Design a protein with these regions (language model features):
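Boundary regions of SH3-family modules and the immediately adjacent low-complexity/disordered segments
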Residues: 69-75, 121-152, 165, 193-227, ...
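...with weaker cross-activation on analogous glycine-rich loops/strands in unrelated enzymes
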Residues: 263-327, 333, 364
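Bacterial N-terminal signal peptides that target proteins for export
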Residues: 44-54
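Active-site nucleophilic cysteine motif
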Residues: 228, 240-259
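Beta-loop motif signature
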Residues: 81-108, 153-182, 236
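SH3/SH3-like beta-barrel superfamily modules
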Residues: 98-130, 172-204
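Bacterial N-terminal signal peptides
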Residues: 53-63
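Aromatic- and glycine-rich peptidoglycan recognition patches
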Residues: 166-168, 208, 305-372
Length: 372
């Protein structure tokens, strides 16, 4: 089956007259109505056959496309973001609510293929991400990505340039905790590759090799709190999980991720992890770095419902994301006193001493997604 400029073949060697010829014959056939009808019927037959052929071609193309997608989906079991921050939605549509986000270089497990891919992030959250915003990988490709030398962005924002020159065009923006493959170093730039193969250069003052970073990253309360406070002023965004914007649990999740620790994504999940602490009236049994939870208190007929979380920083103060990331206080004498949150305070969870002792609080060098 083929097509050229003059003839459309329904079968090999059986041409049907082209439309221009038929139109000319119809226009010039003035001898009789019978001749006009014959030409008219020939045109109808031609157009009908053309439509049949078009439908057949579309069906074949669709089948080939679907087969290719199925074959790729059968082998591609991982998805890695190719933009600095990728939105993950509750449904396969732009209008669906944003549930969470993933960072460039972060491994995600594919649950369902399609134009919108259903994925699971390292913290166990699931949702739909647009196919074009990720690089799908096979098990072998995912292993290669994880095993390769990588750099991790260590400043809030940075740029990957097309050349080792800050005046060259931008390849991509990146944010804290984005990961890129390390290809080499040229003067004061790391030569890097994004998951989709694009290459560029990032200033060495904006990133560190993962190997060196892991030697110095700390999981103590002082370090976690310092990072949390460094995010003060970031805007609140539902589903936000990056240094561009965060919701309450996304703030906690991001703060810990900057220290290479993966926590559950949502406040209701975080409230079940670690050592449970019923908070003393004078807050004396809280320690800096504890997670403090807020929401609806339990009643005789309803259990407590967690809807907010923050990080306790000591002296009856906590840092959290509500409208924006800021510090609030449980002390009525403090200028930062937060009566609203004090009235809905529920309990605390202690997680820092339990890093790598329970599966829900794990450094990424031991996480299955990063070590696959």
């Amino acid at each position: 089956m083929c097509y050229d400029k003059k003839y459309l073949y329904l079968q090999a060697d059986k041409p049907v007259a082209d439309t221009i010829t038929l139109q000319r014959q119809f226009k010039d056939s003035t001898k009789s109505k019978t001749q006009q009808y014959k030409v008219y019927n020939t045109m109808n037959t031609f157009l009908r056959n053309t439509r049949i052929l078009a439908v057949a071609l579309l069906s074949i193309v669709g089948a080939i496309s679907a087969t290719a997608q199925t074959q790729e989906g059968d082998t591609a079991t991982w998805a890695v973001p190719v933009a600095s921050v990728v939105n993950i939605r509750g449904g396969a549509d732009y209008s669906a609510e944003m549930e969470t986000q993933a960072l460039l270089g972060m491994p995600m497990k594919i649950i369902e293929n399609g134009r919108w891919i259903k994925v699971m992030t390292p913290d166990g959250d699931t949702g739909y991400v647009l196919e074009s915003s990720v690089k799908r990988m096979t098990d072998a490709e995912m292993h290669e990505w994880n095993a390769a030398k990588q750099i991790i962005v260590s400043t809030h924002t940075a740029t990957v340039y097309a050349q080792p020159d800050a005046k060259s065009p931008r390849v991509s923006d990146v944010v804290t905790a984005c990961r890129l493959k390390l290809l080499g170093r040229i003067n004061s730039f790391f030569h890097v590759a994004l998951p989709d193969g694009r290459e560029g250069y990032i200033p060495t003052v904006r990133a560190r090799t993962v190997e060196n970073w892991r030697k110095t990253v700390k999981h103590d309360a002082e370090s976690i709190i310092a990072t949390g406070l460094s995010l003060c002023g970031l805007p609140y965004q539902w589903g936000g999980t990056s240094v561009k914007a965060v919701d309450c649990s996304g703030f906690v999740r991001t703060t810990f991720l900057i220290h290479d620790v993966t926590l559950p994504r949502n406040a209701s999940q975080q409230a079940k992890v670690g050592q449970h602490i019923d908070i003393a009236p004078d807050f004396s049994n809280l320690e800096p770095g504890d997670l403090v939870f807020f929401g609806r208190k339990a009643t005789d007929d309803k259990p407590a419902h967690v809807s907010h979380v923050g990080i306790y920083i000591g002296n009856k103060k906590f840092v959290h994301s509500l409208a924006w990331v800021h510090v609030s206080s449980f002390d009525p004498a403090d200028p930062e006193y937060d009566e609203y949150d004090l009235n809905r305070l529920l309990w605390a969870q202690r997680v820092l001493p339990l890093v790598n002792t329970i599966p829900e609080v794990t450094t990424n060098d031991r996480h299955a997604f990063y070590t696959h």
